[in-house]
Amino acid sequence: MSTVTITDLARENVRNLTPYQSARRLGGNGDVWLNANEYPTAVEFQLTQQTLNRYPECQPKAVIDNYAQYAGVKPEQVLVSRGADEGIELLIRAFCEPGKDAILYCPPTYGMYSVSAETIGVECRTVPTLENWQLDLQGISDKLDGVKVVYVCSPNNPTGQLINPQDFRTLLELTRGKAIVVADEAYIEFCPQASLAGWLAEYPHLAILRTLSKAFALAGLRCGFTLANEDVINLLMKVIAPYPLSTPVADIAAQALSPQGILAMRERVVQIIAEREYLIGALKEIPCVEQVFDSETNYILARFKASSAVFKSLWDQGIILRDQNKQPSLSGCLRITVGTREESQRVIDALRAEQV
């Protein structure tokens, strides 16, 4: 009689999964962490809620109301979750039948769309972006049959550019009555004029993902938002955990979304954009850098000569970047988070010293 192992008991698709290689999971012993698009310095908050003996609200009113006001939408159009990553997963769980429906995304882009779908057992379809990383609308149209959710990251991670708004409109028309279009706006605070939040009234099948991890400098909080019309939010409420936000997280999130918190965030954005432009200018002068791409975010994508050697050399010096070589069309590319001036200088000095 054959022995059944624990692994044999697992679902087949889970046995075949490769875990998402987050920046933190890839690790390293660095002291200059420029690999996860975090804000470089800690922001301080005091906990005000001393009710840890009670379960929290499922959707804390102060957080929802503050975010709705900030985003210019109604409270009924906001869902808060454990990071935008949970929002990605909730949309698949609510709209996709495993083994029947598919999601679609356009690489090179954020890795969690595929990981979430594969975990749930939902097919992933990809339509690579065009040479300028804009959407291949014809390619998307050809593959839409059976697709229930389309993910588009704008500004796109890791390339840093915005998706053309006219292409978004075309995509929303193509998918009307067929699929949900998810605009991942994790980095929208760095280019707020480009948000699609004002389009919700026009497109009942539009959902928008947001986060407090980037410009709000709260990656450790794990707090994200889905903006969508009430019908979508009501469906997501059926599949979300009963208490997605702990009391301390809700407390800090509400403070971060107060008028003073939003003002502080906007000041951080101004500072990061200034630092980004400084770093872009310096990178363009460095011999081992072949190309620096424009960015609307808090990170810069650049193509290097001997990028793997450069990546390892900086890693060995305690400077941790994000290698993008495995992404379609990004051979030779590394992604650099915009940090402090001191961190920028460490990167610049290390790259200048590279012999290529």
UniProtKB/Swiss-Prot annotation:
It catalyses: L-histidinol phosphate + 2-oxoglutarate = 3-(imidazol-4-yl)-2-oxopropyl phosphate + L-glutamate. Its cofactor is pyridoxal 5'-phosphate. Pathway: Amino-acid biosynthesis; L-histidine biosynthesis; L-histidine from 5-phospho-alpha-D-ribose 1-diphosphate: step 7/9. Disulfide bonds: none annotated. Belongs to the class-II pyridoxal-phosphate-dependent aminotransferase family. Histidinol-phosphate aminotransferase subfamily. Homodimer. This is Histidinol-phosphate aminotransferase. Its EC number is 2.6.1.9. Keywords: Amino-acid biosynthesis, Aminotransferase, Histidine biosynthesis, Pyridoxal phosphate, Transferase. InterPro entries: Aminotrans_II_pyridoxalP_BS (IPR001917), Aminotransferase_I/II_large (IPR004839), HisP_aminotrans (IPR005861), PyrdxlP-dep_Trfase (IPR015424), PyrdxlP-dep_Trfase_major (IPR015421), PyrdxlP-dep_Trfase_small (IPR015422). The modification N6-(pyridoxal phosphate)lysine is found at residue 214. GO terms for molecular function: histidinol-phosphate transaminase activity; pyridoxal phosphate binding. PANTHER family: HISTIDINOL-PHOSPHATE AMINOTRANSFERASE, HISTIDINOL-PHOSPHATE AMINOTRANSFERASE-RELATED. One of its GO terms (biological process) is L-histidine biosynthetic process. It holds the Pfam family Aminotran_1_2.
